[in-house]
C-alpha cells in the first residue's frame, strides 16, 4: 500500500501566515523582513508537516488554487437580496481583505513565487481555472478504484468531505471541544473495516492493518506525542450528501452563495435564511431525519426534493415564492457547491487529465524527498521585491423544478 499526503495549498499558505500573527506577533507582509519571514515560514511548514506525517506516507501532492471556473458562471441574484449586495462568487471576501492590515497583494505574489519554486522539488498541481478543492476531488476520483493507493488530505474545509472514499480520508486541522487536536474524516466503510470487523474476519485474520490506522489516528501535528481520538471525538464519518444538500439549500457565506429562501423580520432590521434546523423541521413533517442516507435519497429523487422545498416554503413562512425561482437558484448552488467532475468545464478537465498523465509515474513510483527543502531559497521573479468521480453523483441535470 502506497500512501500519499495531498495538501490544500491555499489553506496551507493561510495557515502559515496565521502562524506569524499568533499572540502578540504581527506580520502584515509590508516590510522586507516580514516578506522574508513569510517565505521562510512556508518552507518550514512543509518540513514540519512532512515530519508529522513521515511515518505514515510515501509521497506528497500539493494542490493550489489558480483562478476558478466558478467565476465564469453567471451569478444568481436571489429575489430577497438588495441591489447593493455583492453577488459574485467569493466577492464578499474582497472588502474584508481590503480592510485588513495584511497586504494581500503581497501575500498572493509571495505565495505564487513559493509555488513556482517548489514545482522543481515535488508534485504540484497548479491549473488555471481550477481551485484546490477541484484538484483534490479529481485526483481522488482518478485513484478511486486503486486498492494500492491511499490518500490523506490535509485541509480544514468541511466541503472536502465530498472527496472521502474507502481509499481517501481527510485530516482536518481544526480545533474544537471534541477535536482539540484536529480530526480525521473517514468513510463509513473504512470505519467498519478498522473498528467493526465481523467474526469471520477476526477469526481468519483481516487484510487491513488496523494497527497502522490506530497509530495514524493518534498522531499529533506538533511533536512526537500521541493524542487520543475516538469516533465523534477526533474521528468523524464523512457525510458528503448531507454537506451538499445543506450548503446548496442554506447557502455558503464564505463563498457568497445564498440561501434559496430569505426573508426580513417584521421590523425589517434583521435578515433570515434557511438553517439546518428549518430543514430538520421540514423533514420531521414527513417523518424523516436529517441523516446522510435521507440526504442522498433527496438529492437523487426529484419528487422527494420537490416535496422538501414545498415544505420548507411553509416552515419558513414563504408560501408565495414560485418553485421555478427556487429551482433555478438551487441548480446554481449545486453547480457551485458539488465537487463533481461533471460540473467542471471540459477545457479544464482536459488540462487536468494532461497534467495528471505527466505526473502519474511519479505519483506511483517516487518517494518524497524532504532534503531538497532544507536551506531552500524561493526564486523571486520581481526584482523590486526580490525576497524571498466520483465523490457524489452529478445531480444538477435532474433538479428541474420548472
Give the residues covered by each predicted segment.
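Noncatalytic, basic helical substrate-engagement surface that gates or grips nucleic-acid strands
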Residues: 2-150, 160, 164-186, 338-339, ...
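Conserved SAM-binding loop
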Residues: 153
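Non-catalytic nucleic-acid-binding/docking modules located in mid-to-C-terminal regions
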Residues: 48-66, 83-102, 120-124, 165, ...
Amino acid at each position: 500500500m502506497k500512501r500519499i499526503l495531498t495538501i490544500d495549498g491555499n489553506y496551507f499558505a493561510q495557515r502559515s501566515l496565521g502562524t506569524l500573527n499568533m499572540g502578540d506577533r504581527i506580520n502584515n507582509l509590508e516590510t522586507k523582513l516580514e516578506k522574508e519571514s513569510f517565505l521562510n515560514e512556508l518552507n518550514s511548514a512543509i518540513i514540519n508537516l512532512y515530519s508529522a506525517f513521515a511515518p505514515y506516507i510515501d509521497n506528497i501532492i500539493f494542490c493550489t488554487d489558480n483562478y476558478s471556473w466558478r467565476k465564469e458562471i453567471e451569478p444568481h441574484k436571489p429575489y430577497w437580496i438588495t441591489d447593493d449586495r455583492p453577488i459574485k462568487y467569493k466577492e464578499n471576501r474582497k472588502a474584508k481583505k481590503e480592510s485588513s492590515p495584511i497586504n494581500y497583494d503581497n501575500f498572493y505574489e509571495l505565495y505564487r513565487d513559493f509555488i513556482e519554486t517548489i514545482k522543481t522539488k515535488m508534485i504540484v498541481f497548479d491549473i488555471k481555472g481550477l481551485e484546490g478543492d477541484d484538484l483534490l476531488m479529481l485526483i481522488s476520483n482518478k485513484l478511486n478504484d486503486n486498492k494500492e493507493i491511499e490518500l490523506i488530505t490535509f485541509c480544514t474545509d468541511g466541503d472536502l468531505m465530498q472527496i472521502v472514499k474507502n481509499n481517501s480520508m481527510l485530516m482536518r486541522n481544526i480545533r474544537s471541544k471534541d477535536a482539540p487536536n484536529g480530526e480525521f474524516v473517514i468513510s463509513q466503510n473504512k470505519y467498519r473495516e478498522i473498528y467493526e470487523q465481523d467474526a469471520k474476519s477476526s477469526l481468519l485474520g483481516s487484510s487491513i492493518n488496523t494497527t497502522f490506522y490506530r497509530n495514524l489516528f493518534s498522531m499529533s501535528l506538533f511533536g512526537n506525542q500521541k493524542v487520543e481520538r475516538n469516533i465523534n471525538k477526533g474521528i468523524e464519518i464523512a457525510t458528503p450528501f448531507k454537506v451538499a444538500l445543506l450548503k446548496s439549500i442554506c447557502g455558503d457565506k464564505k463563498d457568497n452563495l445564498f440561501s434559496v429562501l430569505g426573508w426580513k423580520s417584521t421590523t425589517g432590521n434583521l435578515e433570515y435564511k434557511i438553517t439546518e434546523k428549518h430543514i430538520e423541521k421540514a423533514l420531521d413533517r414527513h417523518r424523516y431525519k436529517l441523516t446522510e442516507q435521507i440526504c442522498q435519497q433527496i438529492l437523487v429523487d426529484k419528487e422527494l426534493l420537490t416535496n422538501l422545498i414545498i415544505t420548507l416554503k411553509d416552515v419558513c413562512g414563504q408560501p408565495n415564492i414560485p418553485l421555478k425561482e427556487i429551482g433555478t437558484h438551487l441548480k446554481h448552488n449545486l453547480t457551485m457547491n458539488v465537487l463533481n467532475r461533471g460540473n467542471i468545464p471540459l477545457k479544464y478537465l482536459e488540462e487536468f487529465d494532461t497534467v495528471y498523465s505527466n505526473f502519474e509515474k511519479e505519483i506511483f513510483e517516487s518517494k518524497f524527498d524532504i532534503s531538497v527543502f532544507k536551506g531552500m531559497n524561493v526564486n523571486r521573479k520581481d526584482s523590486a521585491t526580490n525576497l524571498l468521480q466520483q465523490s457524489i453523483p452529478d445531480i444538477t441535470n435532474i433538479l428541474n423544478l420548472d
